[in-house]
Amino acid sequence: MWADAGTAPDRSVLRADYQTAGRGRLDRRWEAPSGASLLASILFLAPPPVPTKLTQAVGRAALDAIEAVAERDLTGRLALKWPNDVLLDGRKVAGVLAQRSVRTAAVVVGLGLNVAWAPDDAASLVDD
C-alpha cells in the first residue's frame, strides 16, 4: 500500500488516468477506461480514529466540487448515499473508499468520479 512506503507527505494526492483492478466496498470491482474518470487517492498520515469520517468528508467535498464546476445546474440532483456514494438523479456518479494501512496509522481515501463514462447502472457528468 502506498501509505506503507513512508515517503509521501501528509495529504499527498496520487492521480490515475484509468483503473483496471480497483475494488470498492465489499470487494466490489471498479474499473474505468482511460480518460473517462477522475481517479485520485489522498494520503492522510494522521487521520481521525474513524476512517468513515474521512470518507464522508471527501464525499461531501466531491459533491460540492461537482456542483461548483458543473456546466449545468445540478441543484437538487446530487446526494450523498451512506456510506460512500455520491448520486446524480439517484444513480452513482462517484464512490469514495477509505483504507487504513496495516503498518502505520495512515489512511488512504480513494475517489472515483464518472466524468465521461459510467457503467450501465451508474451516471456520468458528461453523458447525463
Show where each model-derived region lies.
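N-terminal lobe of the biotin/lipoate ligase/transferase fold
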Residues: 1-75
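Long, positively charged amphipathic alpha-helical accessory segments at protein N-termini or as interdomain linkers
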Residues: 47-77, 88-128
